[in-house]
Amino acid sequence: MKIKIRLFGTLGNKFPEHDPIKGFEVEIQEDSTVNDLINKMGISQSKIGIISINGKLVTPLKKLKKGDFVRMFQPIFGG
């Protein structure tokens, strides 16, 4: 199934097909979770701070559905 993903901060630098405004589509198996998506993309869990699906905050255990729009933000820190 296809989902759309948009990566914020430096998360998108690893993916040349990532459009910083529109994101990009990813093919993933049915019944996959956000964690499965993260693993498939090769992103370290420590690099992700906030995850949302269709505008709602979720955990990595959330199941994905066809057409979902996933946004991932790197951790926010500073002094």
Language model regions located:
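Ubiquitin-like/PB1-type beta-grasp interaction modules and other compact soluble beta-rich domains
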Residues: 1-78
